[in-house]
């Protein structure tokens, strides 16, 4: 049933409602790196370094592709949450159809353009002829997972936007579980090598897309499907494309920031590069936890905007930040005190260990400096204030480069970490600074 347009729909936001989304999504995000470890382990059993290098390079190429298309998940979450908050069932259903349609179009484009994409990727990343041959084999098969993988982004975003975090967790667990099982089966038992890892991914994405379709059909059971006119509504389709475009630019800026960090690390020599790579992995682990709370902020802020209910928006912002800082503080303490043990577990090279420990304090502080960026990104995605998020990301990237230009000549690798910290902090505080104004514009009839 669709409510009257513009009607205020009050609802409560509590710590329980925040954690009900954050905890399942954190578990879902944490299951993803396990897949990479298993793929590496099963190929490692074949005893061929070129095969390991092949799936590593292929994995990086697809990480870039799918990270770029993450707007399908994030944008769908925000639009669905707003439709749910407004009680607009027709639009809520239409968002899913638009997102899946766009996912399929983009996915088939990846298949069509796979050869030039692979050629460009190999040119940029290099590798021995043996590694490039393995990468080519992996890429040629896994490319066919693109329409399925992107459709799964759409399903995931839609269920999260509806507040169905446990369903999203189930889909992600289903995907990674099947992928792991099939990788072991295809590589170790069928002896398909790198092709087996790629085929396992295609099969797992297909099974997950099927599961997502079934679950979505159940959710839509008994309700009228959106008409062609509703799905292709020019204004709403244009809004979705603008939102996705802004998130895409933001994603490219984020990729650029991390690529710059690693390139500047490499310029300092292999030891510093290895040490910084280990410390960056610690930050990435923290990001999986913080992303869970950011996803909760997306859904609740989006729902509040759709419901036109400012108190729920303010409450979702406050609670997600409180829980975010609590979690970030705990992670920072773990990294600070257990960091040396983690570093020793990740490398046996003594020189790398010493350098990593020397800069550990920076990595331990990144969750505290970055949590505001994660949470504000979630709020702005949910509220679909994507243009502001894009602009503040570009501003933060410029400040990052400026900070590096000043700090690195004076402080060396400490200066690089300082610049990265400035980047994280700038993202969060720049968005926070304009939140009040954007909220007043979005909730004009309600007191601040």
Regions found by a protein language model. Give the residues of each.
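Short alpha-helical transmembrane segments in multi-pass integral membrane proteins
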Residues: 1-22, 80-147, 178-181, 187-248, ...
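Transmembrane helical elements of multi-pass membrane transporters/channels
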Residues: 20-39, 141, 152, 175, ...
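Residue-level hotspots within the lipid-embedded alpha helices of multi-pass solute transporters
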Residues: 29-33, 67, 107, 111, ...
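Helix-terminus/linker motif at the lipid-water interface of multi-pass membrane proteins
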Residues: 30-53, 122-129, 185-192, 248, ...
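Alpha-helical transmembrane segments of multipass membrane proteins
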Residues: 37-41, 120, 154-158, 180-185, ...
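Interfacial/gating helices of multi-pass transporter permease domains
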Residues: 43-63, 129-137, 194-195, 199, ...
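Small-residue-rich hydrophobic transmembrane alpha-helices
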Residues: 52-112, 152-168, 275-339, 371-384, ...
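Short runs within selected transmembrane alpha-helices of multi-pass transporters and secretion channels
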Residues: 70-73, 141-160, 168-176, 197-213, ...
């Amino acid at each position: 049933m669709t409510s009257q347009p513009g009607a205020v729909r009050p609802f409560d936001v509590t710590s329980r409602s925040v954690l009900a989304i954050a905890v399942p999504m954190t578990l879902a995000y944490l299951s993803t790196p396990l897949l990479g470890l298993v793929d590496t382990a099963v190929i490692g059993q074949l005893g061929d370094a070129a095969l390991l290098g092949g799936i590593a390079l292929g994995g990086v190429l697809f990480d870039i592709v799918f990270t770029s298309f993450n707007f399908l998940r994030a944008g769908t979450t925000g639009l669905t949450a707003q439709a749910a908050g407004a009680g607009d069932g027709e639009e809520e259903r239409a968002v899913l159809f638009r997102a899946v349609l766009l996912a399929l179009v983009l996915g088939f484009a990846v298949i069509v353009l796979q050869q030039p994409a692979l050629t460009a990727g190999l040119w940029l990343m290099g590798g021995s002829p043996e590694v490039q041959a393995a990468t080519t084999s992996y890429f040629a098969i896994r490319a066919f997972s693109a329409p399925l993988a992107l459709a799964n982004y759409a399903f995931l975003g839609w269920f999260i936007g509806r507040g169905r975090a446990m369903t999203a967790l189930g889909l992600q667990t289903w995907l990674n579980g099947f992928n792991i099982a099939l990788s072991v089966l295809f590589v170790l038992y069928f002896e398909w090598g790198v092709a087996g890892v790629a085929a396992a991914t295609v099969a797992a994405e297909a099974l997950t897309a099927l599961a997502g379709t079934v679950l979505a059909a159940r959710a839509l059971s008994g309700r009228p499907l959106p008409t062609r006119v509703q799905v292709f509504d020019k204004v709403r389709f244009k809004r979705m494309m603008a939102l996705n475009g802004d998130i895409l630019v933001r994603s490219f800026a984020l990729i650029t920031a991390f690529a710059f960090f690693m390139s500047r690390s490499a310029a300092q020599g292999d030891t510093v590069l290895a040490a910084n790579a280990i410390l960056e992995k610690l930050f990435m682990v923290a990001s999986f936890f913080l992303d869970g709370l950011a996803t909760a902020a997306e859904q609740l802020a989006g729902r509040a905007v759709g419901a036109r209910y400012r108190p729920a928006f303010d409450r979702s912002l406050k609670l997600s930040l409180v829980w975010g800082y609590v979690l970030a503080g705990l992670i920072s303490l773990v990294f600070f005190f257990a960091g040396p043990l983690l570093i020793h577990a990740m490398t046996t090279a003594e020189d790398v260990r010493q350098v990593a420990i020397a800069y550990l304090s920076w990595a331990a502080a990144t969750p505290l400096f970055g949590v505001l960026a994660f949470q504000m990104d979630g709020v702005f995605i949910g509220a679909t204030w994507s243009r502001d998020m894009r602009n503040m990301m570009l501003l933060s990237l410029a400040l990052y480069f400026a900070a590096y230009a000043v700090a690195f000549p004076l402080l060396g690798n400490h200066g690089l970490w300082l610049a990265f910290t400035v980047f994280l902090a700038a993202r969060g505080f720049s968005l926070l600074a304009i939140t009040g104004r954007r909220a007043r514009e979005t909730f004009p009839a309600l007191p601040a």
